[in-house]
Design a protein with these regions (language model features):
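ABC family nucleotide-binding domain
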Residues: 2-214
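Conserved beta-strand-loop-alpha-helix hinge in the C-terminal portion
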Residues: 218-242
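Short, Lys/Arg-enriched, disordered terminal segments
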Residues: 1-2, 243
Length: 243
C-alpha cells in the first residue's frame, strides 16, 4: 500500500500563527524505508503525528491507499491506527509490569486471534529479533537495545502498512543503535515493512533508501541511496548538511 502526503500544512494559534508545516508532499511507496531529518522546530514531529492520525492537518490530505486519513471519523481513525500502523519510540513505551513476551502478546490481543495463534506469532517475532531467550524477562532486566528490539517486534506484530519511528536510537549506545538499525533493515528487506523514521543522526539516516530534509516546515531536499553502499550515502548526507 502506497502512502501519499499531499500539500499537508499545519499551523498553531489563531492570533499569533505559527506554521509548523507548509505544503509538504511526498509518497511512501509500499516497502520503502524513508528517513526524515531537519533541525529542531522544522516540523518533523508534527508531520509524524499527522501521518499517525494523532494530530490533524490544517490543510492537505493523507492517503493510505484509497483511505483518506484527513476526513475519517475518530472511530474510523482509531480502527485504522490499530490495523495499519506500528510505532517505535525513543523511550520504548513497554509496560514495566509485563514481560517482553507479554508486551508483544498485548499488541496481538487487539486483533482477536486465538491464544495459540498469538503465542505462535509472538515466538516467531521474538526468534526473528533475537529476544526469544529473554521472553520471560521484564523490561528493567534487559538492555536498552533489547527493549527496542522488543518494541520493534511489537510494532510489526499485526503486519502494519507502515511503521513510524521517532528518534528510535536516541537513548541507545552506538553498538545497540547499530543492532537496532540492522533490525530495521531486516524488517524492511525481509519482511517488506514500510518504515518512516525521524532522526537527527546521520549514521541512522544512512540505513534508509531515501532521505527527506525538512526546514521551517518545508520539504527542501531529497536524497536517494539507489545502489550506493551505506558509507558512501552517509558521506553524501554529511556533504548536504555542511552546505
Amino acid at each position: 500500500m502506497d502512502i501519499k502526503i499531499l500539500n499537508v500544512g499545519k499551523q498553531y494559534g489563531s492570533v499569533h500563527i505559527t506554521k509548523a508545516l507548509d505544503s509538504v508532499s511526498f509518497t511512501v511507496k509500499n516497502g520503502e524505508f524513508i528517513a526524515i531529518m531537519g533541525p529542531s522546530g522544522s516540523g518533523k514531529t508534527s508531520l509524524l503525528n499527522i501521518i499517525a492520525a494523532i494530530d490533524t492537518a490544517s490543510e492537505g490530505n493523507v492517503f493510505f491507499g484509497d483511505f483518506e486519513l484527513t476526513k475519517a471519523s475518530a472511530a474510523k481513525l482509531a480502527e485504522f491506527r490499530k490495523n495499519n500502523l506500528g510505532f517505535v519510540f525513543q523511550n520504548y513505551n513497554l509496560l514495566d509490569t509485563l514481560t517482553l513476551e507479554e508486551n508483544i502478546l498485548l499488541a496481538l490481543s487487539l486483533n482477536k486471534q486465538s491464544k495459540k495463534e498469538m503465542l505462535e506469532r509472538a515466538k516467531e517475532l521474538q526468534e526473528s529479533f533475537g529476544i526469544y531467550g529473554l521472553r520471560n524477562k521484564y523490561p528493567h532486566e534487559v538492555s536498552g537495545g533489547e527493549k527496542q528490539r522488543c518494541a520493534c517486534a511489537r510494532a510489526i506484530s499485526n503486519n502494519p502498512a507502515l511503521v513510524l519511528a521517532d528518534e528510535p536510537t536516541g537513548a541507545l549506545d552506538s553498538h545497540s543503535a547499530q543492532i537496532l538499525l540492522e533490525t530495521f533493515q531486516k524488517m524492511n528487506t525481509e519482511m517488506h515493512t514500510s518504515i518512516l523514521m525521524v532522526t537527527h543522526d546521520v549514521f541512522s539516516a544512512s540505513y534508509a533508501e531515501r532521505l527527506l530534509f525538512l526546514k521551517d516546515g518545508k520539504l527542501v531536499k531529497e536524497l536517494f541511496r539507489h545502489d550506493k553502499d551505506r558509507k558512501t550515502f552517509m558521506s553524501e548526507i554529511y556533504d548536504e548538511l555542511s552546505i
